[in-house]
Amino acid sequence: MLLLLPILNLSLQLHPVAALFTVTAPKEVYTVDVGSSVSLECDFDRRECTELEGIRASLQKVENDTSLQSERATLLEEQLPLGKALFHIPSVQVRDSGQYRCLVICGAAWDYKYLTVKVKASYMRIDTRILEVPGTGEVQLTCQARGYPLAEVSWQNVSVPANTSHIRTPEGLYQVTSVLRLKPQPSRNFSCMFWNAHMKELTSAIIDPLSRMEPKVPRTWPLHVFIPACTIALIFLAIVIIQRKRI
């Protein structure tokens, strides 16, 4: 079977599919949440393939004009007699997204259908933080969330530009961080919005700088202040200890 697949791959590119055997796809695009499971399905008419022993099915992931057998998908062979080639992918990951070719072989005849998997992770949990910037009268607002695909961040009704960046997590998700620095105003809230354009999904968080003020941004003590202060404290402690011993 492993030797047969490369030959079939070449045949799929060079020759039209025989009309004697037809594969259909009840669903061509699958949108799946990270961590959930999915079953990719392509169907065929059992009346066109009378010998059960002659039915073979495989799922190949298409990347860079090449196709490789999917190691993440498991064929549910008990569904073949029902005219279904069902491939189960558990605990979907970001790397499972892409295009697949569902190939069904019936004796000397074969056909295939392309299926697409779109993986998403909603930016539902938005962590917010407020820090007071000493000596400026300004606050630093931060919104951070993880998701997939990459989202755009905007701040509603704010003219000050925000500093937005992202990194990839080991799971392949995007960790997006947006930082805004400005002077707070009484009775004014700020809203950061994460727009996932690929999935047409919008999530947001509201920040009230005055009601949820966190501790100030810690100042770094200069060495020329820190060292003398420690020295004086040690001298004072030594004097106290010596006087107690004399008593």
UniProtKB/Swiss-Prot annotation:
Q: Where is it found, in Gene Ontology cellular component terms?
A: plasma membrane
Query: Which GO BP terms sit in this record?
Result: adaptive immune response; negative regulation of activated T cell proliferation; negative regulation of interleukin-10 production; negative regulation of T cell proliferation; negative regulation of type II interferon production; positive regulation of T cell proliferation
Which organs or tissues contain this protein?
Answer: Expressed in immature and mature bone marrow-derived dendritic cells and splenic dendritic cells. Highly expressed in placenta, liver and weakly expressed in heart, spleen, lymph nodes and thymus. Also expressed in some tumor cell lines of lymphoid origin.
Q: What is the effect of changing R72S?
A: No effect on PDCD1 binding
What is the organism lineage in this UniProt record? Eukaryota, Metazoa, Chordata, Craniata, Vertebrata
Q: Which family does it belong to?
A: Belongs to the immunoglobulin superfamily. BTN/MOG family.
Quote any Pfam family the record assigns.
C2-set_3
Residues forming the Ig-like C2-type domain are 122-203
On subunit structure and binding partners, the annotation says: Interacts with PDCD1.
Q: Residues in domain Ig-like V-type?
A: 21-118
Swapping E41S leads to an effect described as: No effect on PDCD1 binding
Consequence of substituting D33S: No effect on PDCD1 binding
Q: What is its main location?
A: membrane
Q: Which InterPro entries match?
A: BTN3A2-like_Ig-C (IPR053896), Ig-like_dom (IPR007110), Ig-like_dom_sf (IPR036179), Ig-like_fold (IPR013783), Ig_sub (IPR003599), T-cell_Activation_Regulation (IPR051713)
User: In this entry, which stretches build a coiled coil?
Assistant: none
Q: Which residues form the signal peptide?
A: 1-19
PROSITE patterns registered for this protein in UniProt:
IG_LIKE
The job of this chain, per UniProt, is described as: Involved in the costimulatory signal essential for T-cell proliferation and IFNG production in a PDCD1-independent manner. Interaction with PDCD1 inhibits T-cell proliferation by blocking cell cycle progression and cytokine production.
Entry-listed glycosylation sites: N64, N157, N163, N189
- Residues assigned to the Cytoplasmic compartment are 243-247
What are the alphabetically sorted keywords of the record? Adaptive immunity, Cell membrane, Disulfide bond, Glycoprotein, Immunity, Immunoglobulin domain, Membrane, Receptor, Repeat, Signal, Transmembrane, Transmembrane helix
> Which protein is depicted?
Programmed cell death 1 ligand 2
Q: Where in the cell is it found?
A: Cell membrane
- What intrachain disulfides are recorded? C42-C102, C143-C192
> In what way does this protein cross or attach to the membrane?
Single-pass type I membrane protein
> What effect is documented for mutating R56S?
Significantly reduces the binding to PDCD1
